[in-house]
């Protein structure tokens, strides 16, 4: 163990096997908080390697609660967070829209660690049950096209790292792990990352995890598609990885100011998103959500991004998404 720790402190990367061993100790509470703080900080300063990410993922999944295997295609839309953008919860709003479009979505979610409002903080405002049983979540997925898997419920061993993460208040390797340890193991994933340096490594890890089709995005220090700048995309499809850039024109929409999608507290984000998903919100927000849904639709074989964006906007403007949320809150 000391050898592994010394490697980290000297700025050296670990192998997949070494990381797996280390994270098994972390997941079973055998690494104290002081050691854990120094490990996470040292890795963050140096930068996480692909081997470290995949080793940590395998260790976390070993101790996670499983979710039933599905007999149909489904996806997750999730970001690493840690981007300090303080935007409204675009991925969560996009998940609601995607489900209303008829897509099956199993969203892995958590409360905020390094930002003001996490996905679960918003879901609580919408009165959605975060502690639903596997059976209830499965029924919700079957009947309403979407369910939410609350990370602490499925990763009980994260209790050993939660205090350190909250105390550090910086992005760590666990930000990267979040999108990769969905207990349902979705074959389709739209993943936002906080840095372009993570895009290809994230795609490679998803490939090693047997992802069928995944799209990794980053735009101007933001872990989602934005309309104030171009969006970097790395796509995994048919075991091939390609990278390209998208701009608002590719979706058939215009540029907007970055401040147009700023969020705030859970209550503030709830009010904004509720208004938007009732079909009454600002174009900047509804169109930002729509372009993220456009890429989500692409995962399911719908290649025309302009058509996808129009479809998402039509659903948003109809108010049907808010009706979906009400149904979820009453389920």
UniProtKB/Swiss-Prot annotation:
**An individual GO BP term:** L-tryptophan biosynthetic process
Q: Entry's Gene3D superfamilies?
A: Nucleoside phosphorylase/phosphoribosyltransferase catalytic domain, Transferase, Pyrimidine Nucleoside Phosphorylase, Chain C
Residues in a coiled coil are none
What is the main EC category here?
transferase
Positions with a binding annotation for anthranilate 1:
79, 110
Where do the annotations place 5-phospho-alpha-D-ribose 1-diphosphate binding?
79, 82-83, 87, 89-92, 107-115, 119
Q: Which Pfam families does the UniProt record give?
A: Glycos_trans_3N, Glycos_transf_3
Residues given in the record as Mg(2+) 2 binding sites: 223-224
Q: Does the keyword Transferase apply?
A: yes
Query: How does this protein assemble?
Result: Homodimer.
This chain's protein is named Anthranilate phosphoribosyltransferase
Species name: Buchnera aphidicola subsp. Schlechtendalia chinensis
Q: What taxonomic lineage is listed for the species of origin?
A: Bacteria, Pseudomonadati, Pseudomonadota, Gammaproteobacteria, Enterobacterales
């Amino acid at each position: 163990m000391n050898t592994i720790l010394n490697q980290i402190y000297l700025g050296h990367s670990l192998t997949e096997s070494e990381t797996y061993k280390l994270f098994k100790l972390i997941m079973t509470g055998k690494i104290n908080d002081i050691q854990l703080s120094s490990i996470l900080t040292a890795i963050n300063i140096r930068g996480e390697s692909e081997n470290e990410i995949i080793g940590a993922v395998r260790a976390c999944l070993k101790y996670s609660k499983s979710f039933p295997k599905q007999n149909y295609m489904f996806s997750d839309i999730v970001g690493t967070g840690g981007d300090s953008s303080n935007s409204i919860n675009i991925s969560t709003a996009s998940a609601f829209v995607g489900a209303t479009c008829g897509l099956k979505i199993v969203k892995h979610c958590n409360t905020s660690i390094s930002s003001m409002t996490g996905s679960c903080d918003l879901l609580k405002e919408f009165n959605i049950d975060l502690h639903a049983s596997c059976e209830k979540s499965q029924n919700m997925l079957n009947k309403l096209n979407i369910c939410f898997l609350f990370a602490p419920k499925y990763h009980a061993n994260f209790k050993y790292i939660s205090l350190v993460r909250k105390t550090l208040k910086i992005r760590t390797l666990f930000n990267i792990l979040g999108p990769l340890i969905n207990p349902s193991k979705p074959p389709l994933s739209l993943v936002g990352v906080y840095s372009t340096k993570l895009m290809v490594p994230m795609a490679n890890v998803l490939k090693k995890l047997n992802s069928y089709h995944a799209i990794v995005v980053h735009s101007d220090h933001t872990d989602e598609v934005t309309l104030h700048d171009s969006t970097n995309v790395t796509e995994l499809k048919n075991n091939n990885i390609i990278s390209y850039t998208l701009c608002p024109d590719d979706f058939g929409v215009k540029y907007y100011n970055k401040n147009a999608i700023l969020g705030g507290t859970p209550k503030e984000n709830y009010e904004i998103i509720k208004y938007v998903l009732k079909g009454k919100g600002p174009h900047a927000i509804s169109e930002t959500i729509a372009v993220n849904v456009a890429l989500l639709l692409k995962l399911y074989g719908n290649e025309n991004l302009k058509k996808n964006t129009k479809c998402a906007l039509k659903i948003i403007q109809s108010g049907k998404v808010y009706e979906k949320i009400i149904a979820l809150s009453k389920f």
